[in-house]
């Protein structure tokens, strides 16, 4: 398995309440493994690895649990938390692979596809789905965007898309993604919506 070239860190945001799901989404088993473990396995090549979640809620070997700086404020706040933690350990700057906990089809190969686009001058790398929309919850962000994330949150903005609109973004076209990862953006919002073909 190809390793992600350094310096790349990883974070999974798992601080949500799972209200629509009806149970703890991160621990729901798909293909015999909890969603949290499936997403984490796709990011094994990255370091450091951070789980954005309440302290003590989950046990994920090899991952540091970092509590949300703004609990209950959504994934943009989770991204801020991860970037803030990175800034404390690596102020020189690096890339962060940021993933939601409900994407069971993420793979190391998908992340490698994104890292290949992380060139100089870029602030984020994201893929496009079949409708041409960006997918901010399975994307790369440069640690230098922390101030922009915090400014959005301070101003009451919670949408991940609002961040991408303000960044220099490299986009991976859907045709390239679909050729090897056609189900990568299928997420699990409610139990009846479990994607088929997960093994």
Model-predicted segments: where are they?
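Nucleotide and nucleotide-moiety/phosphate-recognizing core
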Residues: 2-160, 165-184, 192
